């Protein structure tokens, strides 16, 4: 009885304690807290968290966002992984496409690399172009056109080597420039080969030259030298390039045939436009009244008699420095024979070729040419009477 009473008392205390404490009842048929209505075990996540284990404020929202993000497929998830694999496949396809494009580009560049530069020098290329032309001469543009058509390597690299062709044409003596004819319009001069440079290649092979060809003297310098030497009279004709090319040497007189090889001809030195005076005016305006008639008679007699005049002693005393001073020995001194070589020879030649025009000019300058010679010889000209007596006018 006591035990039962005590037991009833304890059951009553237990019932009071159960009523005083709030118990969260999940369901009526729950026999155990860890099982649901079907008797299955609950997951620990479905149980509510105790108050002391509750998270900080805002943590459920973050957890909900994480769960929602976990449910949605993305690039980093397995579904996304499969997509990434597809992307990788696309990358592989792109890589394969890029490799095909690179192979195609390599195939296109392969013909360019297969073009090998010809083993000929620029001089050999220019020589080929000139020799194949019908006229054996070409302009710079014609030479470049031949090289481009003949060799594909130079066709693709055309602008780069044109200056090299121009420099080789100008700097090598084996190429000669020919000016363009007046009736042949166009641009640029012609270029041809020097005739002496035909054997500069070994056995006609353009791969190797024997030696560098050098011209001894350029043709235009020879022509200029010939023109310059012709202005020096007979001595210019005796030079190594004194006569133009194409004329025989006998066309010009030898300087030894001249009477005075050390005196050039006076004819070209005389002024052609010398004023000509009438004979009467010339006699009045002579340097000396007594010398005017004598010079005229002497020139007229020299034109018929010869080129050398031999003078004889006259009855009158000779004109000399001793006669002016008054010495007696000068009056009795015999006069020597005098030959008037240079002045009279020049005068006689001029009178024979141009009797009218140059005779007056020579008469005007004859005292200047003859007086110094006669003074040195010690005798002056003879009087007119002695000249007429010895050589009468014919």
Swiss-Prot record:
<feature type="DNA-binding region" description="Fork-head">
    <location>
        <begin position="117"/>
        <end position="211"/>
    </location>
</feature>
<dbReference type="Pfam" id="PF00250">
    <property type="entry name" value="Forkhead"/>
</dbReference>
<keyword id="KW-0010">Activator</keyword>
<dbReference type="InterPro" id="IPR036388">
    <property type="entry name" value="WH-like_DNA-bd_sf"/>
</dbReference>
<dbReference type="InterPro" id="IPR030456">
    <property type="entry name" value="TF_fork_head_CS_2"/>
</dbReference>
<dbReference type="GO" id="GO:0000122">
    <property type="term" value="P:negative regulation of transcription by RNA polymerase II"/>
</dbReference>
<comment type="function">
    <text>Binds to the consensus sequence 5'-A[AT]T[AG]TTTGTTT-3' and acts as a transcriptional repressor. Also acts as a transcriptional activator. Promotes development of neural crest cells from neural tube progenitors. Restricts neural progenitor cells to the neural crest lineage while suppressing interneuron differentiation. Required for maintenance of pluripotent cells in the pre-implantation and peri-implantation stages of embryogenesis.</text>
</comment>
<feature type="compositionally biased region" description="Acidic residues">
    <location>
        <begin position="19"/>
        <end position="31"/>
    </location>
</feature>
<dbReference type="GO" id="GO:0045944">
    <property type="term" value="P:positive regulation of transcription by RNA polymerase II"/>
</dbReference>
<dbReference type="InterPro" id="IPR036390">
    <property type="entry name" value="WH_DNA-bd_sf"/>
</dbReference>
<dbReference type="InterPro" id="IPR050211">
    <property type="entry name" value="FOX_domain-containing"/>
</dbReference>
<dbReference type="GO" id="GO:0003700">
    <property type="term" value="F:DNA-binding transcription factor activity"/>
</dbReference>
<dbReference type="GO" id="GO:0009653">
    <property type="term" value="P:anatomical structure morphogenesis"/>
</dbReference>
<keyword id="KW-0678">Repressor</keyword>
<dbReference type="InterPro" id="IPR001766">
    <property type="entry name" value="Fork_head_dom"/>
</dbReference>
<keyword id="KW-0238">DNA-binding</keyword>
<keyword id="KW-0804">Transcription</keyword>
<dbReference type="GO" id="GO:0005654">
    <property type="term" value="C:nucleoplasm"/>
</dbReference>
<dbReference type="InterPro" id="IPR047392">
    <property type="entry name" value="FH_FOXD3"/>
</dbReference>
<dbReference type="GO" id="GO:0000978">
    <property type="term" value="F:RNA polymerase II cis-regulatory region sequence-specific DNA binding"/>
</dbReference>
<feature type="compositionally biased region" description="Gly residues">
    <location>
        <begin position="77"/>
        <end position="99"/>
    </location>
</feature>
<dbReference type="GO" id="GO:0000981">
    <property type="term" value="F:DNA-binding transcription factor activity, RNA polymerase II-specific"/>
</dbReference>
<feature type="region of interest" description="Disordered">
    <location>
        <begin position="1"/>
        <end position="99"/>
    </location>
</feature>
<dbReference type="InterPro" id="IPR018122">
    <property type="entry name" value="TF_fork_head_CS_1"/>
</dbReference>
<dbReference type="GO" id="GO:0030154">
    <property type="term" value="P:cell differentiation"/>
</dbReference>
<feature type="compositionally biased region" description="Basic and acidic residues">
    <location>
        <begin position="32"/>
        <end position="41"/>
    </location>
</feature>
<keyword id="KW-0217">Developmental protein</keyword>
<keyword id="KW-0539">Nucleus</keyword>
<protein>
    <recommendedName>
        <fullName>Forkhead box protein D3</fullName>
    </recommendedName>
</protein>
<dbReference type="GO" id="GO:0043009">
    <property type="term" value="P:chordate embryonic development"/>
</dbReference>
<dbReference type="GO" id="GO:0006357">
    <property type="term" value="P:regulation of transcription by RNA polymerase II"/>
</dbReference>
<keyword id="KW-0805">Transcription regulation</keyword>
């Amino acid at each position: 009885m006591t035990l039962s009473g005590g037991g009833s008392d304890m059951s009553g205390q237990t019932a009071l304690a159960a009523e005083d404490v709030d118990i969260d009842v999940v369901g009526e048929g729950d026999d155990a807290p860890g099982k649901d209505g079907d008797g299955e075990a609950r997951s620990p996540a479905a149980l509510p968290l105790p108050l002391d284990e509750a998270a900080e404020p805002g943590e459920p929202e973050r957890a909900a966002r994480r769960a929602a993000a976990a449910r949605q497929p993305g690039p980093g998830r397995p579904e996304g992984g499969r997509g990434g694999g597809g992307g990788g496949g696309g990358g592989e396809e792109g890589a394969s496409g890029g490799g095909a494009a690179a192979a195609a580009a390599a195939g296109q560049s392969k013909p360019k690399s297969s073009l090998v530069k010809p083993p000929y020098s620029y001089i050999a290329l220019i020589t080929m172009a000139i020799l194949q032309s019908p006229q054996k001469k070409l302009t710079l543009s014609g030479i470049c056109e031949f090289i481009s058509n003949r060799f594909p390597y130079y066709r693709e690299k055309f602008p780069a080597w044109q200056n090299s062709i121009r420099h080789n044409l100008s700097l090598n003596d084996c190429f000669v420039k020919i000016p363009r004819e007046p009736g042949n319009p166009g641009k640029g001069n012609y270029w041809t080969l020097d005739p002496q440079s035909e054997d500069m290649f070994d056995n006609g092979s353009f791969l190797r030259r024997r030696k560098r060809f050098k011209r001894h003297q350029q043709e235009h310098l020879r022509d200029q030298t010939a023109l310059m030497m012709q202005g020096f009279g007979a001595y210019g004709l005796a030079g190594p390039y004194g006569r133009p090319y194409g004329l025989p040497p006998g066309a010009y007189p030898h300087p030894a045939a001249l009477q005075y090889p050390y005196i050039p001809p006076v004819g070209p030195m005389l002024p052609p436009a010398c004023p000509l005076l009438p004979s009467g005016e010339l006699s009045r305006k002579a340097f000396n009244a007594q010398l005017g008639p004598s010079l005229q008679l002497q020139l007229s007699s020299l034109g018929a008699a010869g080129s050398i005049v031999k003078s004889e002693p006259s009855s009158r005393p000779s004109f000399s420095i001793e006669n002016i001073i008054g010495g007696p020995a000068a009056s009795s001194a015999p006069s020597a024979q005098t030959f008037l070589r240079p002045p009279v020879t020049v005068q006689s030649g001029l009178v024979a070729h141009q009797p009218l025009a140059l005779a007056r000019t020579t008469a005007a300058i004859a005292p200047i040419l003859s007086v110094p010679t006669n003074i040195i010889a010690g005798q002056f000209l003879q009087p007119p009477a002695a000249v007429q007596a010895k050589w009468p006018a014919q």
